[in-house]
Design a protein with these regions (language model features):
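Alpha/beta-hydrolase
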Residues: 80, 107, 183, 236-239
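C-terminal catalytic histidine-bearing segment of alpha/beta-hydrolase fold enzymes
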Residues: 227-271
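N-terminal Sec-pathway targeting helices
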Residues: 4-25
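Short alpha-helix in the alpha/beta-hydrolase fold that links the catalytic acid
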Residues: 93, 213-223
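Serine-hydrolase catalytic machinery in alpha/beta-hydrolase-like enzymes
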Residues: 14, 43-45, 50-149, 245-247
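Short beta-strand/loop motif that positions the catalytic acidic residue
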Residues: 197, 203-205
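Primarily recognizes the serine-hydrolase "nucleophile elbow" in alpha/beta-hydrolase
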Residues: 139-196
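Acidic catalytic loop of the alpha/beta-hydrolase fold
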Residues: 208-212
C-alpha cells in the first residue's frame, strides 16, 4: 500500500511537470508571436496611411484621408478603426463615404501598431489610454477644422467596435463635435455623463452581439433620452458583432447595406 501511494505521487508530479512545460511553451510562443507581429507593424501602417498629421502633444498621427469632389466647404467625418487597428476595410469605407460628399479621415489611434491576431488586438484595445487617443483625435480634429474645403462646424466622429466606443468618449471630451456615430461600440449608460454630448447620436447594433447585449443597448438609449440627447438607435435582428465588415459587403445589400444607408441618411439629416 505504501508503494502504491508513492507511485501515485510520482505520477501526479510527472503530470504536473508536463503541464508546466506545456504552459511555459505556450507563453514563449505567445511572446514570440507578439514580437514577430510587432516587427511587421511599420510596413503595414505605411501601406495604409496617406497623410501624417502634426500633433503638438505627441507623435504625428498617421491617417488615411479621402477627399470628395468639388471645392466645398464639405462636412467631415473622423472614422475610427476596429480593435485590430488600421485595415484596408476601414479605408474602403472611408473612400466610399468620401464619394458621398464628405471629407473623411481614418486615423491610426494605435500609433503605428496593427494586428490580425486576436490576443494582441485585445491587448492593444485595453492598453491604449483614452487620454492618448483624445490627444491624437484633437490633432486630427484641429487639422480638419483648418482645411479650406471643410466646414469646421460640421465635423462628426464615428467608429466601429473599439472605434465606436472611442467615438463616444471623444464626443464627451470635445464639445465641438457635431455628431457621433457608434457601430457596436462600448457604451456609457449614465445620463449625467451623457448630458455632455454636444450633438445627436447614431447607434447601430446587432441583436445577437454577445459583447454588447440588447439590454445594454436599451439602457444606453434610455440614458440618452433621459439626458435630452437626440438619438437614433437601431438593433438589427440576427446580426452579431462587427457585422458591417466591408464596402463590398455593404454594396451586396442585406443588413450591412441597410445599416450603411441608415448612416448616410443620418449624416444628410444631422450633419
Amino acid at each position: 500500500m505504501i508503494f502504491k501511494e508513492e507511485g501515485s505521487m510520482k505520477l501526479v508530479k510527472r503530470i504536473g511537470l508536463i503541464l508546466l512545460s506545456i504552459i511555459a511553451l505556450l507563453v514563449v510562443f505567445l511572446v514570440g508571436s507578439v514580437v514577430v507581429d510587432r516587427l511587421l507593424d511599420r510596413g503595414r501602417i505605411d501601406a495604409l496611411v496617406n497623410t501624417w498629421i502634426e500633433n503638438p502633444n505627441g507623435p504625428a498621427v498617421g491617417a488615411f484621408v479621402a477627399q470628395p469632389s468639388g471645392d466645398g466647404p464639405h462636412p467631415a467625418v473622423i472614422m475610427i478603426h476596429e480593435f485590430w487597428g488600421m485595415k484596408p476595410s476601414v479605408n474602403g469605407k472611408a473612400a466610399a463615404l468620401a464619394e458621398e460628399g464628405y471629407v473623411v479621415v481614418a486615423p491610426d489611434t494605435y500609433r503605428s501598431q496593427v494586428t490580425s491576431w486576436i490576443p494582441r488586438a485585445i491587448y492593444l484595445a485595453m492598453t491604449t489610454e483614452t487620454a492618448q487617443v483624445n490627444t491624437d483625435l484633437d490633432a486630427v480634429f484641429n487639422w480638419l477644422a483648418t482645411q479650406p474645403n471643410v466646414d469646421p462646424n460640421r465635423i462628426m466622429v464615428m467608429g466601429f467596435c473599439y472605434g465606436g466606443g472611442k467615438s463616444l468618449e471623444y464626443s464627451l471630451y470635445n464639445e465641438r463635435v457635431a455628431a457621433t456615430g457608434i457601430f457596436y461600440g462600448s457604451l456609457i449608460t449614465d445620463p449625467a455623463q451623457l448630458q455632455a454630448l454636444p450633438g445627436p447620436v447614431l447607434g447601430i447594433f446587432g441583436a445577437t452581439d454577445q459583447s454588447i447585449p440588447v439590454a445594454e443597448v436599451q439602457s444606453f438609449e434610455q440614458a440618452l433620452n433621459s439626458a435630452g440627447v437626440t438619438n437614433q438607435i437601431t438593433i438589427y435582428p440576427g446580426q452579431g458583432h462587427a457585422f458591417v465588415e466591408s464596402i463590398e459587403g455593404i454594396r451586396a445589400g442585406g443588413a450591412q447595406g441597410e445599416a450603411w444607408q441608415e448612416f448616410l441618411t443620418f449624416l444628410s439629416e444631422k450633419l
